[in-house]
Amino acid sequence: MRSLALAGLVAITAAACAPADQFPSEPGKGVDVGFLPSERGLTDKTTGLIDLWNGSWVAALAVGVLVWGLTIWCIVAYRKRKNDDQLPVQLRYHVPLELMYTVVPVLMIGVLFFFSSKVTADFQDVTPSTQAAGTTSATGEINDEAKASDLEIEIYGKQWSWDFNYLTDDVYYSGDRISLTGKEGVEETLPTLYLPVDETVTFTLKSRDVAHAFWIPAFLYKVDILPGRTNTFQVTPQKEGVYSGKCAELCGEFHAEMLFNVEVVDRATYDAKMAELRDAGQTGRLGDELNRKYLVTQEDQH
C-alpha cells in the first residue's frame, strides 16, 4: 500500500512538472489546462473576470486557513489529557459568538456579491444608442458609460442549431438543425459566428422555441435565452482565434450537439465572410416569423 501511494505521488508530481507544450490547448477548444479559466486580454472583460476568480480563491483560502487553524488549535489545546476525568464546562449558548457566526458570513457574501455583480454588469449593460427597442439587459439597466457598439448581431437559439443575424451588415446565417441533418458534432458542419477583432459587439439573444443558453467558454460568460424574452450583452474580442460555443441549457434530445464555433478575425477577413453571405443571397434578417409558435399556427391554418 505504501509503495502504491508513493507511485501515485510520483505520477502526480511528474504531471505537474511536465512542460506546458505536452498539453496543447487553445482557449475554448479542447480541454483547457491550468488554474486560470481562460487567458487575460482575450476580450475586454476576461481580465476582470479572472481577477474576480483569483480574488475569490484568495478570500476562500484565507477563510479556510483561519477556520482550519482555529479547529486544529482547539483540538490540540483542549484535547483530553491523561487521567483527566472531569467533565468540561458546558455552555448552552454564547450570544456574542453566535452573532459573530451570523454577521461575518453575511458580510463575506455581501462583499462577494458586490464584486460579482459589478463584473457581471460590465457585460450586460449596453449604451442607449445601441440597445434595440424592447430589449433588456439581464440587470434591467442601461449604462451610459458602456462602449459604443461597432457591430450588432442578433442570435436565435433553436432546437438544435443557431441563426445569426448580422444586423450591421444586413446579412444572416441559418444553421441546419442537427435533428434534420443527422451530422451530430461534425466540426465542418457546425455554425460559425464571425467577429472582427478589437471591435465592440452588442449581442441580442432570442429563442425560437424553448429555453437555451448562449455560452462561449473562453469568453467566461453565459446568457440564458428564454422564449418571449430578449437579453443583450456587449463584448470586445481582442485576440484572433477559433473558440468553441455551445448551448448550456438542457433543451431536448440533441442538446449536447447544439454547438457552434466563433472565429475572431481581422476586419478584411470579416468583410469577406459577410460578402460571401451576401453573394449567397442571405441578405436581410431572419425574424420571429420562423419561431415555432408562428410556424405551428400557420400549419394549423392550412
Cite the ranges covered by each PLM segment:
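N-terminal secretory/membrane targeting signals
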Residues: 1-22
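Transmembrane alpha-helix boundary/anchor motif
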Residues: 12, 70-73, 115
